[in-house]
Amino acid sequence: DGARPGDIIFRDVNGDGIIDADDRVRMNKTGTPKWNGGMSIRMSYKAFDFTALIQGAAGAVQYIRTESGDFGNYFKEFADERWRPDPSDPTGMRPDPNADTSGPRAFQREEEYWIANANTFFLRNTDYIRLKQLEVGYNLPPGLTTRLGIQNLRLYANGFNLLTFDNFGLMDPESRNQAGHYYPQKRIVNLGLSLSF
């Protein structure tokens, strides 16, 4: 009842020709990763030093509850890939052949029968690997620093949250917020020096 062009099409799991509660299946994944891991690397060569922290998680999913409707906005992905009618079709029943219509039509969240219950269309894999921290340093030669009256001078550059590899795309895969209402982790880059007298 109430189906319109551009709605999500559900699979008739039990094959009775009716889409109803009997077609629901259990989802064994949650928002909690099954695996968390990380690796710390520390190396030095002559006057150079290098430190890195790589972390990741796998086995979790995130259900996207977009704030579509009168009081919110779509994620860009949903807007760009939404179903659109063919402008040459007066009935508005055929999809636009020139548009990427891999998603459903634009919708009001509170009015759609297919958004009221969780479904796999809005479920996203949150597996990721992130370069959480990276630092490269250089200690000036002691012969140079002692002439300047300095015991040690180290120049360094470091960064945090520099790279993230994931297929999630909509928001930070570490976030547990389903609609993106949070401050994302900042990408930070520093240049500095440390002195010892």
Question: Positions of the model-derived regions?
Answer:
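C-terminal beta-signal and terminal closure region of outer-membrane beta-barrel proteins
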Residues: D1, D96-G103, A116, L162-F197
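Outer-envelope beta-barrel architecture signal
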Residues: W35-G37, K46-F48, D127, G149-L153, ...
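Membrane-embedded beta-strand positions of outer-membrane beta-barrel proteins
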Residues: A52, L155-A157, L193
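Repeated loop/turn-to-beta-strand initiation elements of outer-membrane beta-barrel proteins
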Residues: A47-A52, G143-L144
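Membrane-embedded beta-strand positions in outer-membrane beta-barrel channels/transporters
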Residues: G38-S40, Q133-G137, N190-G192
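Outer-membrane beta-barrel pore domains and translocons
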Residues: S44, Q55-A57, N158-L162, S196
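Extracytoplasmic gating/loop element in the C-terminal half of outer-membrane beta-barrel translocons
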Residues: G2-P5, A57-G149, L153-R154
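Acidic carboxylate motifs that coordinate Ca2+ or other divalent cations, activating on Asp/Glu
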Residues: D16, D20
